[in-house]
Amino acid sequence: MSKTHVYELAKKMGVENKELMARLKSLGIEVKSHLSVLEDEDVQKVTAPPTPPKGVQQQEEVRVTTTVIRRRPKAVAQPPEEVAPAAVESAVIEEAPAPRVEAVPEEPKASPAFAETVPAVEEPKGVEPKIGVPKVETPVASESKAEEPRVTAPPAQPKPVAAEEEKPTMNRARILGRVELPGLTTASKPVPKPAERREVVIPPKRKMEERAVTPQPAAPVADDRKKKAKTFTEPETPAGGAPGAKKGAPGGKKKEAFKKAELLEKRERIFEPGPKTGKGRRRERESVTFGKKTEITVPKAIKRIIKISESITVGELAKRMGVKATDLIRVLMKMGMMATINHPLDVDTATLIAAEFSYEIENVAIDTDEMLESAPDTPESLKKRPPVVTIMGHVDHGKTSLLDAIREANVIAGEAGGITQHIGAYDVELNGRKITFLDTPGHEAFTAMRARGAKVTDIVILVVAADDGVMPQTREAINHSKAAGVPIIIAINKIDKPEAKPERVKQELMEFGLVSEEWGGETIFVEVSAKKRINLPELLEMVLLQADVMDLKANPDKEARGTIVEAKLDRGRGPVATVLVQEGTLKVGDYFVAGVHSGRVRAMQNDRGDKVLAAGPSMPVEVIGFTGVPDAGDVFISLSDEKKAKEIASHRQQKLRETELAKHSKMSLEQLYDKIQKGEVKDLNAIVKADVQGSVEAVSDSLRKLSTDAVRLNVIHSSVGAITETDVNLASASNAIILGFNVRPEPKASAMAEKEGVDVRLYNIIYDAVEDIKKAMEGLLEPTLREKYLGRAEIREVFSVPKVGNVGGCYIQDGKVLRNASVRLLRDNVVVYEGKMSSLRRFKDDVKEVATGYECGIGLENYNDIKVGDIIEAFEIEKIATKL
């Protein structure tokens, strides 16, 4: 037994899959899709010629046996008796509107009959009758002539009633109408509603003959039918009086005239209540509006309100108000502001300008603060949290040494110049209780970061060296702490030194209102030694005691909120930020927004490098998953909706761009006049690159403070990462210098800088960079030491030599390496070590130099932490006279 798929059978039958499936379901054959399998019996059922329902067959047999159609041409009066009277009336009624519907046949006399049949085919079944129309044309035309003598005009008036009463007769007469009874078919098929709709569409103002022939049927081919109807205007007009047309006798003209009057009467009756549509209405509207004069209108009050977000350009504002941009610029000049068409205007300025033209400005900027608001915490939801402690103090007073002593980790050895290079956050546990420490650099360049640290901290430990006393940076730290309302604990460090004078330190601090408890004050003083580990437990106990007094609490059961402590760009992990969670719990997978950046927490690590799945209040974690490097001090907010986080970040980015553009493009007439009077202002442009975001901001702020009346220092670009070719191109175009802090330029960038003559200055200590630029601006810069690049070597293998240490098996990539040259070890373009070379060998022989393309062994002086893939950069120091 063969099986056939539905789609195969549909292809053979030439029908669509859906159509065949519908037919199968109507036959009671269940199929799920076009891939369903059909049995042979089912195929035979479908392919068998369709048989109409039994009721219809009986009706057909009765109609055919009565031979109603064949009697009509012979006897005019008898057929109406055999056929239902209502059917005859409906047939007579339909003959009047029929000529308006369609006039497709070629013969003038046959066209009325065909016109009668077309609506009959169209109305009952919608689409199918259209297919059957051409088949009916010839027989209908011939037999309509025999039928027409029986039709009389008077019965046409009761048309609407008769048509509605004879709906069942219509359905029975449809099949007969195809063969022999066009009159009955016409009467049964059309439904009154569509017929009325067609007539209503016809414009009433046309001439009698055209209106009788050109209806607007609901069929898709209305336009073609209208054209054909117009062509056969003469013969179709008598179609309403088809009997006269059939006889061909002189009385036909009378019939035509009578039919015209009847049609006119009907149209007047139908068209009076109906609304005007189509071309007639359009022509009437055009005729009315053609004679009107153009009026100059004033916009409505609601249209005179312009909605803007934060700012708007002059051109856009002019466009919305419908005025010329030059008029707006003229108003701005009267207000003392030079502007172009692309000049951005803030809300206040735009409001003043719009008022000149009788417009109002409405600020529709998104309120991100409102979107990020959280419900206040209930007292029951608050739980105790660890204190956050910030260590502050002057340069080289021992802040990092003290913190390292507490953490029992000796990481101070690699610090350059005794200065902490970036903010760090650490978690320390003491007697089952945790304390979070923030380590801030002591140089004045980090004023902004220290202020941010004071905002997130609970307690400040102010480190003062017993042998040095109170210094300028110590005063700044005290001022920041007092401004933030943070309690201060004084740690007098280096008491193990012979020259230590802790009593003098206490006396100096009294000037700032910090009086020791021993002297009757309220400030806690602890004498410690980070080097000798003296009194460290006592210091931590004082911190915990102060925390108990403050009763620090937070709600861990909510979306996390915190602060960005530090951020950097890691080559392997992308943007990485240290986040201090202040309330709520941050989990892996949470969406967040921080400043102008958003993201999703992909991974978290604590200060020891261990992976963390959740971080509660007062816990610092390193978060991976930012879209960009955020700024230190940005508020970190966890959100449940990614779309919301992206929307807020996008809005903040746009706002930042508009603010920056407005800040750089503003220039008033007074400023322009001052510049002309003073002459050309000398600008010193600088590009700042550093290893972490906090250092970038600190260097940029310090450089901006160095601007004087003679020389203005502009930081045109600052970012995290190595110095690249893009930076060199920008410096070359802007006539700027490049300042690198703890980063190195890429090889191609170094070559381009030398070719373009761009001054690239590299520093390990921010203080040196600021002092050098300050001296250069003052003309006091001494002959400087310039670095001469020699070559680069890549470590491809690491060998451990007894009593010597690790030696790197290197390949010289470019230049040459000299034995007495200084070297720098780079890991991901970040300086890891800088010093001297202890050995340079080839095949167990000491050599003076190794050129490009050769391999050699290089040992570093007092340094063994070398890895495969590290770069050793060789250089020499030259003394060159400095030119301003």
Swiss-Prot record:
GO terms for cellular component: cytosol. Residues 194-212 have a biased composition (Basic and acidic residues). One of its GO terms (molecular function) is GTPase activity. Residues 393-400 are annotated as: G1. Residues 493-496 are annotated as: G4. Residues 439-442 are annotated as: G3. Coiled coil: none annotated. SUPFAM superfamilies: Initiation factor IF2/eIF5b, domain 3, P-loop containing nucleoside triphosphate hydrolases, Translation proteins. It is found in: Cytoplasm. Residues 418-422 are annotated as: G2. Residues 234-248 have a biased composition (Low complexity). Residues 529-531 are annotated as: G5. GTP binds at residues 393-400, 439-443, 493-496. InterPro entries: EF-G-like_DII (IPR053905), IF2_II (IPR044145), IF2_N (IPR006847), P-loop_NTPase (IPR027417), Small_GTP-bd (IPR005225), T_Tr_GTP-bd_dom (IPR000795), TF_IF2_bacterial-like (IPR000178), TIF_IF2 (IPR015760). PROSITE patterns: G_TR_2, IF2. Belongs to the TRAFAC class translation factor GTPase superfamily. Classic translation factor GTPase family. IF-2 subfamily. HAMAP family: IF_2_B. One of the essential components for the initiation of protein synthesis. Protects formylmethionyl-tRNA from spontaneous hydrolysis and promotes its binding to the 30S ribosomal subunits. Also involved in the hydrolysis of GTP during the formation of the 70S ribosomal complex. This is Translation initiation factor IF-2. It comes from Geobacter metallireducens (strain ATCC 53774 / DSM 7210 / GS-15). The gene is infB.
